[in-house]
Amino acid sequence: MRWLSFRYDLSSDEGWSSSPWIELGDWTRFLYNNYDFYEGNKVHWEHFYVGIFRCNQVLANVPAIEMDEVQKNQLLAQASFLRALWYFQINLLWEKGTLVLEPQNADYIPKDASEQEIWDQIEKDLTFAMENLPEAWDAADLGRATKGAAKALLGKAYMQQHKYD
C-alpha cells in the first residue's frame, strides 16, 4: 500500500517524472503495460488479493463463533469494508480482476470478473458495512472503519461509475 498514493499521484494532472526509471514516466501517461514491473503491478495485485483472502477468512469463519451479535456484525462489517476497499483499488487500477468471495484452496483457479461485477460486490459489501459499523470507535479502536468511512467509499464508488442520482 505504500506505493499506492504515489502511483495515483503520478497518474494525476500533477503527475510528472523525469526519472530514468521508465515505469515512473509510463505511469504519468497511464501506461501500465510492463506486467513484470515488480513494485507497480505485482506487489499491488498480490497485496490486494492477500487482503481479500484475509477478509474472506473472517467472513467465512466469524459467523460460527459464539459471541455478542452486535460485536460479530461489527467484525463482519469491518471485513466487508476492507474487502470493498481492496476491490475498489483493483477496479481503479486494472478495471477488472477476479471476484473471490470465499476462502479457496491452493489449486483454485479464479475466473475473471467484469468491472461491473466488481462494482456490484463493492456496493453490496459497503451497504452491509454501513448498516453494521458504528458512527465512531473509542480511543482504543481509533482508526477502524466507521459508518462514515463506508458511506464515503460508497460515494466514491458511485462517482467512479458515474452514478450521480
What annotation goes with each model-predicted range?
Residues 91-93, 98, 160-165:
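Short coil/turn linking the two alpha-helices of tandem helical-hairpin repeats
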Residues 21-94, 108-117, 126-142:
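Conserved, well-structured interaction surfaces
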Residues 1-15, 57, 116:
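Acidic, glycine-rich segments characteristic of secretory precursors and extracytoplasmic regions
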Residues 103-107:
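Short edge-strand/loop segments of extracellular domains
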Residues 49, 53, 148, 152-153:
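A structural signal for well-ordered alpha-helical segments within the folded catalytic domains
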Residues 139-146, 164-165:
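Outer-membrane beta-barrel proteins
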